[in-house]
Amino acid sequence: MSNGSDKAGWLTSVTLGPEYDEELEHTLSCWVSGVSGLPDDKVRSRWTSVQSPPLPVDDDGCDFGIMAFISDVTPAFENQTEESTELWRHEEIECLVSFYGPNCQRYGTCFRDGLAVSQNNDELGRFGLSVDKSSQLTALPELINNQWVRRYDMTITLRRKVVREYGVKSLVEAPVKFFGD
């Protein structure tokens, strides 16, 4: 495997880039908790390897999950140095957020309205994220163990800039011979 353009082979990023996986999910959990007003332990990531037990029907809570990463079509290559260049692109992160329990409307609408508060967006910006758009809050009650559980869902699209560094060397000199007259 090559990690520089001075040798043949595949190039992988030499920097990690932004948060993904559990780190990103932890950041999103703190964000949803902080903006909605739900306690930290009541906001849970969906689709984890270890599933949390379901909340009691009379308890309020929220599950969220990242449904898609959507990138812009054309990345830009910037900051070329002798040793590397940076790939810049913008990425959208589409999240499904579900509020459960007897006060799910209250927490869902508090979260929805909190998305418009500039201080909340500034705090989210510390993690390189911003709210791009959100859907309406939609009722989707679930029948679990022959009991209706109140549930309201919304989709949030976050946006961020992704920067990755690659070992693409700059061309400093190239030996050239001209033939002819």
Each PLM stretch: what is its role?
Residues 87-102, 111, 150-160:
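Oligomerization/assembly interface segments of phage tail-like spikes and tubes
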Residues 106, 116-163:
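Acidic-leaning, charged glycine-interspersed low-complexity segments
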Residues 153-181:
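Acidic, proline/glycine-rich low-complexity IDRs
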Residues 54-56, 137-139, 164-168:
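Aromatic/basic-lined ligand-recognition segments
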Residues 23, 104-109:
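Short, conserved charged micro-motifs
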Residues 80-86, 143-144:
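Short beta-strand/turn micro-motifs at beta-sheet edges
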Residues 107-110, 167-169:
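A short secondary-structure junction signal
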Residues 1-81, 172, 176-181:
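Small/polar-rich, solvent-exposed N-terminal microdomains that initiate assembly or binding
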